[in-house]
């Protein structure tokens, strides 16, 4: 399911929200309709936490996370950290990172298995990412841009990268990540993919300006049109498990 939304007249959905397979973060003060887009799809499935990070609402650019963990910058206040710990599932590890490049959402892109990071991140940061998120970490650029989190969106099913990414780069990244990649855009031609959308394994939210062709590319590369609601994934797995008992 891919849906379009706006955060207070902004199409940069990925700036004001973070979405994973086990939780969603939405900036506080979000106009109700923005929050309700997430609520409609996720309410009974995963917790949706309204929060600020370091007193700001650009939470999607300051945080990076997956099903297993959430990384926040060192400027995150104790109250915000406690609020996140109270709101997110107990098995999600939340870790503050002391890093010069503190807009973590711009410099890290990850799914539940792999992370691509800015080539200049500290070695210590790389180790924390691998440990907290439980992923394999690669230092990469996307179409010669070091801000991998800004120019790519990634789930366990696929990835969307900057429209000027060469075929050779796409193939290299695809083999690192072990998921299919497509070069494309969001919000009527914007190449800032990470800032313009959020995605998990069954849902994507993009800016209101995203065109129908862009939306169909998103639905196909992230395999969102395949009835992959979380409940259905579980039930199909359950069926195969039951069959294997006999």
Curated annotation (Swiss-Prot):
Q: How is it modified after translation?
A: Phosphorylation at Ser-174 and Ser-175 promotes nuclear export.
State whether keyword Protein biosynthesis applies: yes
Instruction: Enumerate the GO terms in the molecular function aspect.
Output: ribosomal large subunit binding; translation initiation factor activity
- Keyword annotations of the record: Cytoplasm, Initiation factor, Nucleus, Phosphoprotein, Protein biosynthesis, Ribosome biogenesis
Keyword DNA-binding attached = no
Q: Which domain of life is it from?
A: Eukaryota
Compartmental location: Cytoplasm; Nucleus, Nucleolus
Q: Which residues carry this modification: Phosphoserine?
A: 174-175
What protein family is recorded?
Belongs to the eIF-6 family.
Q: What's the subunit arrangement here?
A: Monomer. Associates with the 60S ribosomal subunit.
Q: Which NCBIfam families match?
A: eIF-6
Role of this protein: Binds to the 60S ribosomal subunit and prevents its association with the 40S ribosomal subunit to form the 80S initiation complex in the cytoplasm. Is also involved in ribosome biogenesis. Associates with pre-60S subunits in the nucleus and is involved in its nuclear export.
Protein name per the record: Eukaryotic translation initiation factor 6
Organism, per UniProt? Answer: Sordaria macrospora (strain ATCC MYA-333 / DSM 997 / K(L3346) / K-hell)
